[in-house]
Amino acid sequence: HGLHILRNESDIQVLRNVIDLLGAIKYWSFAECGAWEEQNEVSRLSSIGIILAGLFKIQSYVKVPFELLQKGLSVFMEMFPNETTTRQYDLAQLFLIYPMNLLTGTQKQIILNNIEKNLLRENGVIRYLDDIYYNVNGEAEWSFGFAYLGIIYYQLGDREKAAYYYHKIIANSKDYNIPELYYSGTNTPNDNTPLGWSLALTIELAYLLNK
């Protein structure tokens, strides 16, 4: 967003250290807990994609070994569009579209179709099938899923669809008191209300729609 994050040579050295670490752990085949900070699993599409997007971005500041890009891209393309070997769909895959902007137009549409067909619910987007977090008679429905979808559709030029998702968010939220999630099939939010993540994305979507 135009912010100058790198202040001096010390900050540049931090980037070099991160690159060395990613190579040392072989990030493309590393077991980690992903965006939801849950069980470790090797090679998550969303995690590999986020790292790849970052590596591409910092190439103008530091040297990124070709192998780090080549290995990551190879595994990413082999896995796409599945999130892991055991999970096809995941809300975290939307991060690859926004804010990472990593995917081609066709890839974006595949991810959007998969999310809307399989994870979309009345009051939000479930993170993945059989998610046990706040699961009461079904997977919890996350408010910010609508915000991500709205922002993405706005960026794709579909203002009507973006507005549709914005109104879905605020339909159950009084005074922008937007929760983390709603219990499955209900208008009942959990106690993490309001959630800064949900609120920030909704404000961003509102800003875009009012430009």
Model-derived features: positions:
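Short, surface-exposed loop/turn segments at secondary-structure junctions
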Residues: 5-9, 33-41
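Loop-centered beta-sheet repeat module
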Residues: 39-84
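Alpha-helix N-cap and loop-to-helix initiation/capping positions
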Residues: 10, 43-46, 194-197
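Extended glycan-interaction surfaces of carbohydrate-active proteins
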Residues: 16-36, 67-142, 164-211
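Well-ordered alpha-helical scaffold segments within catalytic/enzyme domains
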Residues: 1-7, 50-63, 95-105, 147-158, ...
